[in-house]
């Protein structure tokens, strides 16, 4: 009997037959997708994220405002001077209450705005340079035309004389001593023209601008000076940022400057300089006599006799910076030793005889960085936060520099803010020129009629009541004065602080009585209730404090005092 084969099961792995229906069925099977449950965000977390975003955008907007103000400042200084200073001051006052919110706040980059501002500034600088070139070309053309007209006039005058002689038939040499003579007038004009040309030649420090431009590639600074001192418990290099450029000027340029400052000194001694341009003090003190000439914006000045005078013109009157020294500043800017936006607006010429020395100088707050000193003679200068000296003015400090003739010292950073510098005595005569920039808001008179007058100048003739000023870059530069031990005391220069805008404080009754940290957010209410801190004692939590001790018997009856009274029997 034949046994029929049973049909193979679909699960039999030994089956050799191919069943496409099975494959199709296997492919058609779908796997369900599991959807994760929706994340629920709390309302408080959403508000915190939104406030964080607002703060970041707020900080970015503040950075954009800073970039725009810097752009306007650079643009206006290159064109027409300070016109937006009042606007900048108003913006700064308006943003004072932003500081607690924006302190250490991170924000997205504003590099795109900064790059566009740089492009605009570069284009404006190029246009301004092209405009100056065109103006110089027009001036040169006018000078050429004027010279040709003068020559034509001279030829016409000579022709008229010859014609008159030919008509009369007599040729005679006539000496005309009349002051209205054409020949005399033309000769005097020629002399004046030659004098003007000579004066113009003396107004430029160099003979060839091409040579000066090529010299910029050869100028290499000497830097990396070290003078370690203790500042608030930390070892700090107090001369960081000091750069020295040796033999910056040539011998003929130094000779021209020496002759020029000698003429200025003679004019100052004879009283021919305006106002307080020439200053002579300590005349009877041997070795410490000082002669100096200040030009441009004043840094020293006398105290006026009438302090209560309402005369608005009662200001320090000095000579402007002469063209020759302006040419020196132009070369420093061209050689990129001083940035254009920090161009000096004042300078002081110091004269030292044999054995004379200066008092240590520390940058006052109303002077900007950098400060540059050009020495026209071989000199020795000492640097340091603390300087020691003997009775003959031999100063010793952490750093002593022997400077060659024509060297330039550029002081930035710690070397300008922390370190004092002094000119040491020497056996030869010395001349130095210090270039500086005074902040515009310190020498513009914005004071009220009844407020004390402040010109932003350093007063050397009468002490004033010292007022606390903020430390520069977070350090305290006050030093105990111990002259008997040989440690140098600070220079006896009374410094007028920069004008401070008045701050309006609310009444004590309006301010909240609760405790606080002093940082108030804009959306916080002043009179909001506050829970007591748990770690305070129960008496303080219930606001029951101990009564104050009674006042001393020496105080008047019915009166109170905020300070304890000590009675000595």
UniProtKB/Swiss-Prot annotation:
Biased composition (Basic residues): 531-545
Reported cofactor(s): Fe(2+)
GO molecular function: demethylase activity; metal ion binding; mRNA binding; mRNA N6-methyladenosine dioxygenase activity
Cofactor descriptive note: Binds 1 Fe(2+) ion per subunit.
Chain residues that bind Fe cation: 366, 368, 421
Source organism of this protein record: Arabidopsis thaliana
Coiled coil residues, start to end: 118-151
Record's compositionally biased regions (Low complexity): 551-560
Sites where the protein binds 2-oxoglutarate: 430
Record PANTHER family: HYDROXYPROLINE-RICH GLYCOPROTEIN FAMILY PROTEIN-RELATED, RNA DEMETHYLASE ALKBH10B
InterPro entries according to UniProt: AlkB-like_sf, ALKBH9B/ALKBH10B-like
Region (Disordered), start-end ranges: 164-190, 531-569
Transmembrane segments: none
Keyword Coiled coil: yes
Function description: Dioxygenase that demethylates RNA by oxidative demethylation: specifically demethylates N(6)-methyladenosine (m6A) RNA, the most prevalent internal modification of messenger RNA (mRNA) in higher eukaryotes. ALKBH10B-mediated mRNA m6A demethylation stabilizes the mRNA of the key flowering time regulators FT, SPL3 and SPL9, which are involved in the control of floral transition.
UniProt KW keywords: Coiled coil, Dioxygenase, Iron, Metal-binding, Oxidoreductase
Protein name per Swiss-Prot or TrEMBL: RNA demethylase ALKBH10B
Enzymatic reactions: an N(6)-methyladenosine in mRNA + 2-oxoglutarate + O2 = an adenosine in mRNA + formaldehyde + succinate + CO2
Family as reported in the entry's similarity comment: Belongs to the alkB family.
Polar residues bias spans: 180-189
Disrupted-gene phenotype: Reduced vegetative growth and late flowering.
EC number: 1.14.11.53
Domain of life: Eukaryota
């Amino acid at each position: 009997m034949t046994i029929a084969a049973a049909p193979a099961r679909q699960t039999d792995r030994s089956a050799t037959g191919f069943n496409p229906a099975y494959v199709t069925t296997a492919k058609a099977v779908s796997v369900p997708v599991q959807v994760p449950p929706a994340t629920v965000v709390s309302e408080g977390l959403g508000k915190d994220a939104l406030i964080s975003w607002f703060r970041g955008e707020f900080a970015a907007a503040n950075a954009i405002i800073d970039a725009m103000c810097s752009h306007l400042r650079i643009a206006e200084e290159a064109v027409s001077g300070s016109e937006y200073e009042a606007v900048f001051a108003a913006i700064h006052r308006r943003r004072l209450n932003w500081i607690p919110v924006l302190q250490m706040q991170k924000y997205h980059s504003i590099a795109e705005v900064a790059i566009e501002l740089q492009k605009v500034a570069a284009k404006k600088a190029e246009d301004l340079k092209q405009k100056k070139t065109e103006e110089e070309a027009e001036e040169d053309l006018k000078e050429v035309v004027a010279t040709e007209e003068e020559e034509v006039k001279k030829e016409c005058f000579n022709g008229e004389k010859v014609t008159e002689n030919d008509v009369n038939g007599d040729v005679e040499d006539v000496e005309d001593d009349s002051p209205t003579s054409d020949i005399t007038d033309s000769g005097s004009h020629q002399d004046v023209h030659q004098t003007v040309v000579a004066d113009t030649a003396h107004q430029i420090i160099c003979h060839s601008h091409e040579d000066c431009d090529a010299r910029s590639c050869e100028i290499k600074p000497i830097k990396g000076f070290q003078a370690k001192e203790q500042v608030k418990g930390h070892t700090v290099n107090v001369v960081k940022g000091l750069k020295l450029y040796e033999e910056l000027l040539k011998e003929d340029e130094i000779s021209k400057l020496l002759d020029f400052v000698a003429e200025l000194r003679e004019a100052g001694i004879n009283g021919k300089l305006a106002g307080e341009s020439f200053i002579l003090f300590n005349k009877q003190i041997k070795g410490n006599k000082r002669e100096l000439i200040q030009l441009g914006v004043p840094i020293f000045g006398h105290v006026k006799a009438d302090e209560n005078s309402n005369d608005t013109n009662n200001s320090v009157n000095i000579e402007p910076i002469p063209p020759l020294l302006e040419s020196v500043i132009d070369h420093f800017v061209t050689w990129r030793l001083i940035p254009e936006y920090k161009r000096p607006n004042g300078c002081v010429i110091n004269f030292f005889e044999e054995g004379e020395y200066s008092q240590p100088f520390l940058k006052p707050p109303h002077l900007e960085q950098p400060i540059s000193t050009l020495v026209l003679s071989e000199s020795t200068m000492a640097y340091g936060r603390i300087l020691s000296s003997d009775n003959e003015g031999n100063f010793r400090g952490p750093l002593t520099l022997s400077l060659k003739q024509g060297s330039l010292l550029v002081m930035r950073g710690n070397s300008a803010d922390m370190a004092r510098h002094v000119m040491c005595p020497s056996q030869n005569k010395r001349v130095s020129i210090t270039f500086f920039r005074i902040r515009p808001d310190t020498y513009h008179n914005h004071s009220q009629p009844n407020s004390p007058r402040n010109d932003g100048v350093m007063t050397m003739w009468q002490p004033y009541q010292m007022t606390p000023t903020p430390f520069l870059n977070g350090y305290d530069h006050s030093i105990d004065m111990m002259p008997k031990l040989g440690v140098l005391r600070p220079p006896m220069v009374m410094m007028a602080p920069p004008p401070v805008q008045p701050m309006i404080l609310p009444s004590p009754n309006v301010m909240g009585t609760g405790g606080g940290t002093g940082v108030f957010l804009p959306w916080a209410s002043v009179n909001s209730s506050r829970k007591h801190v748990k770690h305070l004692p129960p008496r303080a939590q219930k606001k029951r404090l101990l009564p104050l001790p009674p006042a001393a018997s020496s105080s008047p009856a019915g009166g109170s005092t905020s300070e304890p009274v000590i009675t000595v029997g």
